[in-house]
Amino acid sequence: MATANGTRRYLRIALIVIAAVEAVGALMGVPGIFYDFNPTTPLGKFAQWLTSADLVLAVPITLAALYFAVAGRLRYAIAAIAIRVLVTWLSDLPSFWIHGIEWSLSYGGITVAVYDIGAPLIALAAIYLAWRNERLGLATLLVALPTILTWLGVLAFAIGVMIHGF
C-alpha cells in the first residue's frame, strides 16, 4: 500500500506542476481576450470569438485543475487539464477552413498534424482513464504531453537563439 501512496504523491506533484504552468499561461493570456484583430469575414469573426472564449475559459479551468491537484483529487485534476486541451483544440478548428489543412513533411507541418490529430485523442483518453479510475499515471502523462511539448519547443528555440543569435 505504501507504493500506491508514493505513486499517488508523485502523480499529485506532477499534476500540480502541470496545472500551475497552465494556470500561469492562462493568466498571461487574459489581455488577449480584449484584443481585436479586425477580422473581415464572418469566419474570421467566429474564429476570433472562439479564441476569446478559449482565453476566458482557460483561467477557471486551469485554476480548477490546480485546486483539484492540490486537494489530491487526481481524477478531477486530470479531467480539468484534459478539458483545457479540448477547449484549445476546438478554438483552433476554424483554421482548417481559413488556411486549409496545413500538414506537410516539414517540422511545422508535422507539429500541426500531430496536434490536430493527437490533442483530442489524448484528452479523451485521459478523461476516459480518469473516469474509470484506471492507469492514472498514463492519464497524467497524456494530459502533460501538450505542456511538455510546448516547453520543449520553447527550449529548442532558446538554444537556437543562444547558438546562432537573434
Question: Residue locations for each model-derived region?
Answer:
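Short alpha-helical packing/oligomerization segments
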Residues: 87-127
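Aromatic-anchored segments of alpha-helical transmembrane domains
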Residues: 21-28, 83-95, 145-156
